[in-house]
Curated annotation (Swiss-Prot):
It comes from Pseudomonas putida (strain ATCC 47054 / DSM 6125 / CFBP 8728 / NCIMB 11950 / KT2440). Monomer. Interacts with DnaB. HAMAP family: DNA_primase_DnaG. Residues 261-343 form the Toprim domain. Its EC number is 2.7.7.101. RNA polymerase that catalyzes the synthesis of short RNA molecules used as primers for DNA polymerase during DNA replication. This is DNA primase. Residues 94-115, 425-449, 476-519 are annotated as: Disordered. The gene is dnaG. One of its GO terms (molecular function) is DNA binding. Belongs to the DnaG primase family. It catalyses: ssDNA + n NTP = ssDNA/pppN(pN)n-1 hybrid + (n-1) diphosphate.
Length: 660
């Protein structure tokens, strides 16, 4: 029966489940101390790094980063959506899943059962049909044939055509005002802010549907056929599409071959499709963003090796360096990354069509550089290691980056190579990394989650998502050459601006220095509360320190209030209340990173953060009242509040019963 699954039932189901039973029915577990271990079912490995904790009712893989509760495991392992996983686990537990009708006051449930999915799927079908039969399709067909694409590849990637005109899709799908509003939310329509006129976002373009890991269409890319700009146009950010997390072609690559050994990262849709046309069905592309740590995390869950294939110009080399930075924190032992730069004026699309698959593969094998070689070669462009000053500068640049590598063996080998170049012992390198200035192009904290992307998303944290059925649907120094052997540096004068450039674009831009990760206090408080929900009961009133403009503070308040209203909920039950949302992803990422770590003085740190947030909100309120008093007359209530703030004796400013 269709309908919403009550949150109370989901809480009860999770409470009844034993994650060891759930996982062991699908994966052979071995008892190791108080936990259980196995080879991870989500990526290839020979040494077990997958751990299940019966105490925490949580699983985590130290190799690929997969983790979550029993419900999440079944979703990922069995390839089920949320309601199907609930049904499966309820059936195993002998429970019947109740259903209830949605209430008017409920907010839209996204992205678990978002109405955007069927709408985007319908739009994709419209574009595909237009490519087959629209009167204006000839330009699109000629373009695709001119790129050497077969009908089979066009079908596999779902290619389509957005006809010229302002309202083709609008007329086809926008039957009423409400439907048009959903189309705007999905990025299919644009609404003029002044006139209110609505029109198709994609017009006269070859269309590339973008799919998530389950094959659901979440966005589109369009390549213009005429002279309009931009040449390539992506869907905007939506509740179901986040550019910094998705990779074009990953779903198609995995669908074609579930046992991939390496994935090629290229720069555009046509590069992915051109390689697929030539039989290389293992390429992906980012969606108008730099390669992020989230991208690498996803890629290394699928394959042990990543090849970055970029243009050899300055932009391509800058993109490669940023990809290298994102790769470092994901380099567990057993993983590898390579870099291939193409001849000037060429891209994978043009090159593979010109020289063929065999020659292109030979180019990869002969000219790609291991990450370590590329790393030291590029730093050698910035710091001339033939002088003592250059050696010191190179050590300063390299040390903090090397310490980002989690794989102990690779990290030590990188230290050893830096010693061969600079003469510094590995211990000195480690010490130098700890002293590095806190300026970096790398994320300031937890590399496993894109917190900046989270900050642009504004759901209602107080709204507990309900769930219904949804479509199923990455003395003389030596210079490493391409083979990795040693050879002396050239006697030619060092030219900092020689071809290839420095790893970053602006000459006056600070070189990359990576500090030890520092987590913002609010995220630390969220993490602590997840592992110790009973702390919420000691907070008297969370609402007074909520900063309406700060997303993490809002989530902290919502989590405290949820734990206070339901004091018996476990950590996993709390996280499940935000399942399928961006805040749920954040909570899970926080829980995964520290679920086996025990810290001292957690309670004191938690209430120190609460006190700090209270003080910050008090200062903000004081500033707002003072500003208003200079512009207009305050009300009696505002005057009383201002006096209280000035005396630092505002009611309810003590957040805990103990006065913390």
């Amino acid at each position: 029966m269709a309908g919403l699954i009550p949150q109370s039932f989901i809480d009860d189901l999770i409470n009844r489940l034993d994650i060891v039973d759930v996982v062991s029915s699908r994966v052979q577990l071995k008892k190791t101390g108080k936990n259980y271990s196995a080879c991870c079912p989500f990526h290839k490995e020979k040494t077990p790094s997958f751990t299940v904790s019966p105490d925490k009712q949580f699983y985590y893989c130290f190799g690929c980063g997969a983790g979550g509760n029993a419900l999440g495991f079944v979703m990922d392992h069995d390839n089920l959506d949320f309601p199907q996983a609930v049904e499966e686990l309820a059936r195993a537990a002998g429970m019947e899943v109740p259903r209830e009708q949605g209430r008017r006051d409920q907010k839209p449930r996204q992205p678990t059962d978002s109405p955007l999915y069927p709408l985007l799927d319908a739009a994709s079908e419209f574009y595909r049909q237009a490519l087959r039969s629209h009167p204006s399709r000839k330009a699109a067909v000629d373009y695709l044939k001119g790129r050497g694409l077969s009908g089979e590849i066009a079908r596999d990637f779902g290619l389509g055509f957005a006809p010229p005109g302002w309202d083709n899709l609008l007329k086809h799908l926008g039957a009423d005002t409400l439907q048009q509003k959903v189309m705007i939310d999905a990025g299919l329509l644009i609404e003029n802010a002044e006139s209110g006129k609505r029109y198709d976002r994609f017009r006269d373009r070859v269309m590339f549907p973008i799919r998530d890991s389950r094959g659901r269409i979440i966005a589109f890319g369009g390549r213009v056929l005429g002279d309009d700009k931009p040449k390539y146009l992506n869907s905007p950010e939506t509740p179901v599409f986040h550019k910094g997390q998705e990779l074009y072609g990953l779903y198609e690559a995995r669908k074609h071959n579930r046992n991939l050994d390496e994935i090629i990262v290229v720069e555009g849709y046509m590069d992915v499709i051109a390689l697929a046309q030539q039989g290389l069905r293992n390429a992906v592309a980012t969606l108008g963003t730099a390669t992020s740590e989230e991208h690498l995390k996803r890629l290394f869950r699928v394959v042990p090796s990543v090849l970055f294939c970029f243009d050899g110009d300055q932009a391509g080399r800058k993109a490669a360096w940023r990809a290298l930075e994102s790769t470092l924190s994901n380099l567990q032992d057993g993983r590898r990354a390579r870099f291939l730069f193409l001849p000037e004026g060429e891209d994978p699309d043009s090159l593979v069509r010109a020289e063929g698959t065999d020659a292109f593969m030979a180019r990869i094998n002969q000219h790609s550089q291991p990450l370590a070689d590329y790393f030291f070669e590029q730093l050698g462009v910035e710091a001339d290691p033939r002088s003592l000053e250059g050696k010191a500068h190179m050590a300063t640049l390299a040390a903090p980056l090397i310490e980002k590598i989690p794989g102990a063996n690779l990290r030590q080998l990188m230290r050893n190579r830096l010693k061969e170049i600079t003469g510094l012992d590995p211990q000195q390198v480690e010490q130098l990394a700890q002293q590095a200035p806190a300026t970096s192009s790398m994320p300031d904290y937890d590399p496993g989650y894109d917190y900046d992307a989270m900050a642009s998303y504004t759901p209602d944290y107080g709204d507990m998502p309900q769930h219904d059925y949804a479509p199923v649907h990455q003395e003389q120094a030596w210079k490493p050459n391409k083979g990795g052997s040693k050879k002396p540096w050239s006697d030619k004068p060092w030219d900092k601006n020689r071809k290839g450039g420095k790893p970053w674009q602006q000459r006056d831009e600070a070189p990359p220095r990576v500090p030890a990760p520092v987590e913002p206090p609010t995220l630390a408080a969220l993490r602590t509360l997840l592992h110790h929900p009973l702390l919420a009961g000691k907070v008297e009133d969370a609402s007074h320190f909520a900063d309406e403009e700060h997303l993490y503070s809002q989530l902290l308040v919502a989590l405290i209030e949820a734990a206070q209203k339901n004091p018996g909920l476990s950590s996993m039950q709390l996280i499940a209340r935000w399942h399928g949302t961006e805040q749920g992803r954040l909570l899970r990422a926080l829980a995964e990173k520290e679920w086996l770590i025990v810290a001292d003085n957690l309670e004191q740190q938690f209430f120190d953060t609460i006190t700090s947030l209270s003080a910050r909100q008090r200062e903000r309120s004081l500033e707002q009242l003072l500003r208003k008093s200079r512009q207009s007359e305050l009300t009696s209530e505002e005057k009383t509040q201002l006096l209280a703030l000035l005396s630092r004796n505002v009611p309810a400013q003590t957040p805990t019963s103990s006065g913390a």
